[in-house]
């Protein structure tokens, strides 16, 4: 069983697609009804940043609960280190929005266009994953994985704006 956590409009067939937003018709709104140790893969694309900072560990512990031993989570988040570098280097093209100057684009990006509550560096996410019980925590590249199962990265988007992290239960 594979879970797309925070699926939005991207709802692949044969995955359990979960989103709390009522505009998306999904079978589940959270992980509560997913049995313990039942899932092989969880993909969470640009979702952890929408969770209040103090609730992130609770979400990661739920991932641990539903993953089978050896199951893997793949999390992608806005890469704030790259964003700061782009800002310092006056790279307006890093920020794909319609604002007319770098400062406005950077400001909009930092709040992930008003949807973000928690931006994490890759190291901060690594610590949170470790503290939640994950192991083999690895930063991976866009469309690359530490697994032989390519399904885990088929939902990747935003190659230049995001970083990708995988961890095993």
Question: Model features per residue range: what roles?
Answer:
Residues 1-8:
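Conserved class I S-adenosyl-L-methionine
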Residues 36-37, 70:
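Beta-strand-connecting loops/turns
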Residues 3, 18, 78:
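Active-site flanking residues adjacent to catalytic metal/cofactor-binding acidic residues
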Residues 9-36, 44, 141-142, 146, ...:
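Adenosine-cofactor binding site in Rossmann-like domains, unifying the SAM/SAH pocket
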Residues 41-47, 56:
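A short beta-strand submotif of the Rossmann-like class I SAM-dependent methyltransferase core
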Residues 55-58, 62, 68, 72-168:
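S-adenosyl-L-methionine-dependent methyltransferase catalytic module, highlighting the catalytic core
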